[in-house]
A protein has these predicted regions:
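Nucleotide-activated chemistry modules centered on ATP-dependent adenylation/adenylyltransferase
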Residues: 1-5, 9-194
Length: 194
């Protein structure tokens, strides 16, 4: 059975894919807000993992709504959760199994139990979070066992994280992203498997 894994190119989604590959035919899926936003680094990360990879584009207007939500709320959490739910829902139309790399202590993205149940009731889709029981320290230990990654500040690494494009849209709307997004947020990019 195929499992679509939402893939940013980072260590969490990569580790989720590796763990799921024991039981599923993993396909890595990266979402962007506009056509042509594909990242060569994310494609290279997918190739290094050895899983099929494709990119999808969100419907029009979602990026602007997400940026407006960040500005209105004063923080990105609700916007990132909205975008993540949009990605999972889009894939639920195609796949019986959709997964991501959310961990035990992640605040975002985090889908509430009611949304997960709705995905099953409406689409017959299982939403898997293979890292949900793992705290960050344990994820990092497993990553060092299975993957080689580079790390850096948000925006300095060419990954497929939603936040990068949302930050750019907030800036395009004339706002300082430092007002809304936490400083010193480190992200990762897979270089190769061990």
């Amino acid at each position: 059975m195929n499992a679509a894994v939402l893939f940013s190119g980072g260590k969490d989604s990569a580790l989720a894919a590796v763990l799921l590959s024991r039981d599923y035919e993993v396909e890595l899926i990266t979402f962007h807000f506009r056509p042509g936003q594909e990242s060569g680094e994310v494609t290279a990360a997918a190739e290094a993992l050895g899983f099929p990879h494709r990119t999808c584009v969100f419907g029009p207007g979602l990026l602007s709504r997400a940026a407006d939500m960040v500005i209105a709320c004063g923080f990105p959490n609700d916007a990132i959760n909205m975008v993540h739910l949009s990605a999972v829902t889009a894939l639920a139309h195609e796949y019986q199994v959709v997964a991501d790399g959310t961990r035990f202590n992640d605040r975002v993205p985090r889908l509430p139990r009611a949304e997960v149940q709705r995905l099953w009731n409406r689409y017959g889709c299982s939403y898997l979070r293979p890292l949900l029981g793992y705290p960050k320290a344990e994820v990092d230990r497993l990553v060092t066992r299975f993957l080689v990654v580079s790390q850096g500040e948000t925006g300095s690494i060419g990954n497929g994280d939603y936040e990068r494009e949302i930050r750019a849209e907030v800036r395009a709307k004339g706002h300082d992203t430092g007002t809304f997004f936490p400083g010193h947020h480190e992200q990762s990019l897979v270089i190769r498997k061990r």
